[in-house]
């Protein structure tokens, strides 16, 4: 007849097992409670966010801070994606895409840097920008509709880009060791999002090259952020500017984006090179693409936001 374990021993083992299970469950629940909650749960849903703060960045640019549902929420926006803001303005529904300058490391709020296009300033756009003027008119506490994540590109890290040819197509993997970027005006925001995401990871080998076009020196938004990153990561991030109307002491390029500028300041065409474009349609269609064609960049090497 075998030795039977005593009831006391069995009870002790049971208590010990329950204690371990309780500790494991407690640890899981604590970790789960500390995990930030995601705001953008469904890309087809609209989320009302409250305006927290509005600050002046430059003569025509504002930084808008919106509150997320709680102080422990993150926006939930993958790198490379953007959001849509929608509002009914003068009886019409207006929808515009924006890329935040904050990331999912920031909890409780999301920041947008937006250039305000006022009425009567630009002869080609006498009414100005509907959405930017609407946002500028908001009072602290007003609500705005956000929707996302949206976009055909996302960054998975270490040079891995998932790019959809169109909305209905599955993403295709594109691996780049060198990332060239041409931005115009507020087209800098998706570029800055990517640059920050790449540079903050020491193991990410991707090199970034940015050509940033603006009309005047005071139109350069987020310049301090860019120059700080360049100084901090001189071997991983190269920065160059061009202005339509530069001051006399300007040491960068002058005029529209040219083939020479691209050749001098961006990586040459290669299988491991990806070029991203974001800016006013005339700049992208009339200055960038024809010059990229001339220099031998294939369509596979380019992505236009």
Swiss-Prot record:
CDD domains hit by this protein: cyt_b5_reduct_like (cd06183)
Catalytic activity: 2 Fe(III)-[cytochrome b5] + NADH = 2 Fe(II)-[cytochrome b5] + NAD(+) + H(+)
Cofactor(s) named in the record: FAD
Record keywords, A-Z: FAD, Flavoprotein, Lipid biosynthesis, Lipid metabolism, Membrane, NAD, Oxidoreductase, Steroid biosynthesis, Steroid metabolism, Sterol biosynthesis, Sterol metabolism, Transmembrane, Transmembrane helix
A GO molecular-function annotation: cytochrome-b5 reductase activity, acting on NAD(P)H
Domain of life, source organism: Eukaryota
Boundaries of every FAD-binding FR-type domain copy: 44-156
GO CC annotation, single: endoplasmic reticulum membrane
EC number: 1.6.2.2
Membrane topology value: Single-pass membrane protein
Cellular location(s): Membrane
Transmembrane segments: 8-28
Keyword Transmembrane helix: yes
Enzyme class: oxidoreductase
Residues that hold FAD according to the record: 136-166, 175-210
Example of a GO biological process term: sterol biosynthetic process
Pfam family of the protein (one): NAD_binding_1
Record function comment: NADH-cytochrome b5 reductases are involved in desaturation and elongation of fatty acids, cholesterol biosynthesis, drug metabolism, and, in erythrocyte, methemoglobin reduction.
Family stated for the protein in its record: Belongs to the flavoprotein pyridine nucleotide cytochrome reductase family.
The name this protein goes by in its record: NADH-cytochrome b5 reductase 1
The species this protein was found in: Mus musculus
């Amino acid at each position: 007849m075998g030795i039977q374990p005593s009831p006391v021993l069995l009870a002790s083992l049971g208590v010990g097992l329950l204690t371990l299970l309780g500790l494991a469950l407690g640890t899981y629940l604590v970790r789960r409670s500390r995990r930030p909650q995601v705001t953008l749960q469904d890309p087809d849903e609209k989320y009302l966010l409250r305006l927290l703060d509005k600050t002046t960045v430059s003569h025509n640019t504002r930084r808008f801070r919106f509150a997320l549902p709680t102080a422990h929420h993150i926006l939930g926006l993958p790198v490379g994606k953007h959001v849509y803001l929608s509002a009914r303005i003068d009886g019409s529904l207006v929808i515009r895409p924006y890329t935040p300058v904050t990331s999912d490391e920031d909890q409780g709020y999301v920041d947008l840097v937006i250039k305000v296009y006022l009425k009567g300033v630009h002869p080609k756009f006498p009414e100005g920008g509907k959405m930017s003027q609407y946002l500028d008119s908001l009072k602290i506490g007003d609500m705005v509709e956000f929707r996302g994540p949206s976009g055909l590109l996302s960054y998975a890290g270490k040079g891995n880009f998932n790019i959809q040819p169109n909305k209905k197509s599955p993403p295709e993997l594109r691996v780049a060791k060198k990332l060239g970027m041409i931005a115009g005006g507020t087209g800098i925001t998706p570029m800055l999002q990517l640059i920050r995401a790449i540079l903050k990871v020491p193991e990410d080998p991707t090199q970034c090259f940015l050509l940033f076009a603006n009309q005047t020196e005071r139109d350069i938004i987020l310049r301090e952020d860019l120059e700080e990153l360049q100084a901090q990561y001189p071997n991983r991030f190269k920065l160059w500017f061009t202005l339509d109307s530069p001051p006399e002491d300007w040491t960068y390029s002058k005029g529209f984006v040219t083939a020479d500028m691209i050749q001098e300041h961006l990586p040459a065409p290669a299988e491991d090179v990806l070029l991203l474009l974001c800016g006013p349609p005339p700049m992208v269609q009339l200055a960038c693409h024809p010059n990229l064609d001339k220099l031998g960049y294939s369509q596979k090497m380019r992505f236009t936001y």
